[in-house]
Each structure stands twice: as C-alpha cells, then as structure tokens.
C-alpha cells in the first residue's frame, strides 16, 4: 500500500527516539562555560592593556563617549581573542526594521603581496561598517540611487562568537543608520531613549536626595523577556505550505483533543523537547544569556523559556539572538520552532511578556517599594510617573504590539485585550486610593509608610496578586507588559516606555522644582503625587479585563479601544507623538514617519502573502481533492444504481450534492479573494 506524504511523516515519527538527540555536555560546570564565547569583562581584562581596559569599562559602565584613541587596541584584542577560538571572520550584527537580525561578514585576512596573508582587524573596521541601506526597510529614507548606510559599534552590548559547522565568526553588535544620519534600526532609538530616561530620572533623584547621600551617575531600564514558542516535527512542517510561507496554519480542522483538559501547562516536558531545551540552554549560557526558566505552556506543543533581567539594550539583543538560536537548535533536533503569535486556530497563541523596571548604577531598583521612608517616597514617585505615562500614551503603547500575527491573539481569552490598563494589586491600589482621598494613612499588616510628614501603609514586597488578564501589571518590583507578540523585537515597546516615562518624570520634576524648598518635604511632594494620580486614575483597573463589562467601563472612562492593527496604526502620526520623540531626541519627525510607513507596509504585505498562499492552496490542493471526491462519489452512486434497481440512494445523492455545492462555493471564494487581492505586487527595484 502506498503511503501518503502525511502517513509517511507520521510513521517516521514513531521510529524516532523519544528522548531526542543526546547532547554532549562539557565536563566543566555551567559557571565555567557561562559567557565563554563573549568578549566580556574577563576577556577584556586578559587581552586589553590596562589603560585601554579602564577606558573601555568607563564607556560601558557609565555610558561615557568612547575614546577614539583606543579603537585600534580594542579591535586587535578582540581579534586575538576571537582567533584563539578559531574565528576567521567578523560581522557587524544589527537589527534593521525587518523585525529580524542582519549582518555582513568579512574575513580577517589581509594579503601581504608575497603570496601569503596576515590576520588584521583595525579600529575603523570595528567601529564602522558600510552595508547597503536601500535594500532594507527605510520608509523612503534610502533608495537604490542613494543607498549608503553605516553600522556603528555599540560597546554597551558585548561582542560574541557564532559557531557554525565549518567555522567561527566574531559578531559585533552595532547600530544602523543612513548616510544622512537617520536611524534605520531598532537599536538606535532604544539607546537614545535610555539616554533621555537617564537625564530625567537623575533629575528627580537629585531632588529627592538626602545630604551626604551617594547620587546615581546613571539610570537605565532593565528588562526580562519571557519567550513563548511552539515546536513541530520538521517532516510535518514541510507538509504544510501555509506554515512554510506564513508561519501559521491558514486551513485545518480542530483536533479531537486540544487544551480542554488543561493538562499541558507545567506538565512533564517530553524527552525530545527537553533534549532540545537542554541543548539550547547550553548555547545560550555560552553566549552569556542568563536563561533561567523552562516549562510547558498552556497549548499542546507550546513552551516557554525566560532569562533573568538585564539592561534593556543587552536584553533586547539577547532576545533577538535567542530567537535565532531557537530556529538553529530546533533544526538540529529535527524540529521546527514556530514563533508566530497564533500558529493554530483554537489553541492559545504565543506572547513575549516584557518585564520592565528602572535601575541605577548604585544597584537600586526604582520600582521596588523599599524598606524605609526615603525608598518608599522614591518608589511612589516613579510608580506615579509610569502610571501617568501609560495613561497619557495609551495609543503609543498599543501601537508597539500591533501586527498581523498579534491581531489573532490580543483580545481573546488567552492574552490581554486591546484596551491598555494598569493593574496594581489590592494592597497597592489601597495605598493609591488613600493618597487620592487625602487620607493620612491606611492599614496594611499594622505598618505605616512615611512620605516626608504623612504616613501611609508599609508596603510589603509582594503587594499584588497575579492578574493575567491585565496588559500592564505591577508584579512587586517591576511592571509586566503582557501584550507583545512572540515574534517581535522588544526594542520598540521599550524605547516607547523609556520615552514616555522620561516625559512623565520631567513633568513631575518641574512641579517639584516649582515648590519652595521648605515645602517639598512638608507635604509638597506628596501633593504632587496625589494630583498626578488623581488625574490619571482612570487607567487603573483591578478586575477581569476579559469581561464585556470592562469594555463598557473603559469606554465610559475615555480609554482607547484600538481593536486591531489598522486602528492602532491610524493614531501613530498624531502631532503629539511626533513631538514627543523629537523633544527627547529619540526620533526625528522624518525617522518616526518612516517607521509608521514601514509598520503599515509590513502589515499589508503579511496579509497579501497569506491571501496568495490561501488562493494557491485552495486552487491546487483543495479544489482538485474536491473534484476527485465528487468523481469517486458519483462513480459509487452509478455503480449502486446499476447493481440493484430500486435502492434508496437519497443519502448518497445528498452527499454528492453537498460535495458539488462545496466545490462551487470554494471556486467562488477563490475568485472573490483573487479579485480583492487585485494585481500582483510590482517587482522591486533591481539591487546591484
């Protein structure tokens, strides 16, 4: 009997080892191999001259301008370190506005003129590269006859080594810009937004500082990203044209058993998947990515892996690298990793929770309630600032998670709704309510929190329950933004968060600075907090965000309900948004408008691709199958009639009629979709 391709694929699965590929774990401990392929502080100390090492560390730790005089020395040390691992090439690794990573690789060799070659790597080659900027999304900033672009070394994110079966490449994280200086990537505005946040956050901290208290020299955002994904055997994946082209199924029947019994979440991980995860963890640890957690997610074949938090630029780089490695390691295990937000209809989709906090170079988490009055006052100001920022810029925050894939996920009972709201937890909400009401204190475990002269309940570290329906939830010492999609870069949500928080902190700083110094500690700062919370309390919601009643309540409060990507993108070019990014030098008007054009075009192209794939599958797979079924049924009906006259064949006739009607409906749907899709896309400009 001849097997169908699907039957052959399923049969092959039965003979695959359930434990997957065995990973050869090195004899050394994790602590010895962690960061082994990263040009980290230990490698820098070993390979750099002492004075160069100190200057480079000052740039990295304090955000100081890089001293150009050390570039050659750093480049040579980086090259020597990489060559010691067998590296032959280097690349400037950047994140264009495709949502993926990009690079161009060059070798270290320099011909000597005598038929030999030496290995060289100059400071100029380290600090600047020159890729073609017109072949990547630019929103009209770069075109084919104006194609020059530059990559610039980002010393804040360490260089690392990428291994392939036939070699090793030194990979250098970089920013990407045009010849005119316009940012063409996601990293550049993230770095700029961190600088804006640093200025305004230190301004507020200086206003709160006590005599003799050490002052922060640098403030920055920290992020921990929870990455969700699906796994499928590669043989089954390649049987699906829709999954190959779109990353999700466009057609299909629901399985007899999905996630109804809630028996997959946190269940024992299958051996083959666990082998994949262990192999992936080893690669991640060697690259200095602090992966911490692994577990089954809610849907069958869905999983999650999450790292410990890092500074926002490094965290975003590491998440992009992790997504690359998810695909690479899955391939080695005969699996395919699906990062689409909704690969299967009827099953939970995948997200990427963005855990956001703000820290200082002194080790303080400014979103931690703390243990004394000074820390609690600082916490309440930064908490208030972020609440105000989210309320004022709901549209921007919603736009950061707008995509064709995420539209299938947001608003279903598996992810936060499209309405942005903030959850604080009952205890902290009580503190906020007491402040707004002007009450001197409330009760919480019998303790009190002192804000200058007034008292409020002492805040325990775990002040919240977990409201998994909330898009923006406080979780004890950070905010968890739960709306980002699993496949997206986290740079966009985080440079928006940094920028809107910087604006909010500046507003609060101006209000405090306007107070007489004697009044600041005598209830003045508390009044600023109260007035700000009163103005923005509408964004706070402690209940079920899935409930229909919340949609109605949100409308009464004047909150935005941007249900899909077109609605969210429709507000991006509002004057207030353009002015915000220009004010804090995060993005110019030209840069911002180019991004909105790119996001809109990406959304439309995604839908066009899905439409073309749907037409192709329907016309070449389903329609012929329907015609074959019709022919087979008609032959069967004719044979039955010829074999015995007088048989009751109503059921068979109805079945044949149903098949014929379905074929007719399918052809009409194909024609209609072709008509709505319109003409095929114009061929792109030739690229030299």
Per-region residue spans from a language model:
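C-terminal amphipathic alpha-helical interaction region
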Residues: 532-688
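N-terminal hydrophobic targeting/anchoring segments and the immediately downstream early-domain regions
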Residues: 2-27, 144-152, 158-160, 164
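Residue-level "edge-of-site" marker
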Residues: 72, 95, 124, 296-297, ...
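Short, solvent-exposed linear motifs at loop/edge-of-secondary-structure regions
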Residues: 63-64, 69-99, 220, 225-233, ...
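Glycine-rich, acidic/polar active-site loops that bind/position phosphate-bearing ligands
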Residues: 148-339, 348-351, 358-599
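Histidine/acidic residue-rich metal-binding segments in metalloenzymes
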Residues: 15-123, 127-146
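Short linear, low-complexity motifs centered on an aromatic residue
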Residues: 99-114, 128, 133-134, 240-242, ...
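Short, intrinsically disordered, low-complexity segments enriched in Ser/Thr and Pro
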Residues: 110-144, 262, 385-387, 509-519, ...
